[in-house]
Amino acid sequence: MVKNFFKIAWRNLIKNKVYSLINIVGLAAGMAVAMIIGLWIYDEVTTNSHFKNYDSVYQVMMHQSFDGKRYSQQALPYPIGEELKAKYPDFKKVAMCDWGQKHSLIVGEKKISKFGHFIGEQAVDMFTLKILDGDKNPFREPYSIVLTDETAVALFASENPVGKIVKMDNSTDLKVTAIVPKPPKTSSLKYDYLIPWTLNEKINP
């Protein structure tokens, strides 16, 4: 019985090639669009969901107009952090963060290039940074650095890196204060290391 159904369906496909092609292409296109929409929804729902209070964490953007067009960007003046705290007391925590860039990290003869951010002290709570080892408040001192577990292994192998010194760009000595996991793929904040925002203010006044 089932075999006959397939035979009849095949004959109809051959007999009405144009209509069959239109139907098949339409079905394929519909399924592809549905999959794309599903992936987009999944991305929207899961992005930063590992933050403890992800539904209360927002990024401040700046609008600028050029030649009649409006643009949004992440670049903000340094004082904005303190201004937000002063003028909006409902903001429980505020953490400045730069765009991120690659720096050379050097330990002895080892030299690797990794991507990271200067970031504010309150980022630990805001972004639910899980401290695997080291200081629970690792951004208190400006000349410090937090490494992901992967970066720590790349620099120190099996040694405990906490308390050790990493030289950044062959010029700045930073003490490793904590180790954190590498952020998940669903995180909008990507990094191999994190450095206190206070150091950024010192070297980029």
What name fits each language-model region?
Residues 5-14:
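A short amphipathic helical element positioned immediately N-terminal to and/or at the very start
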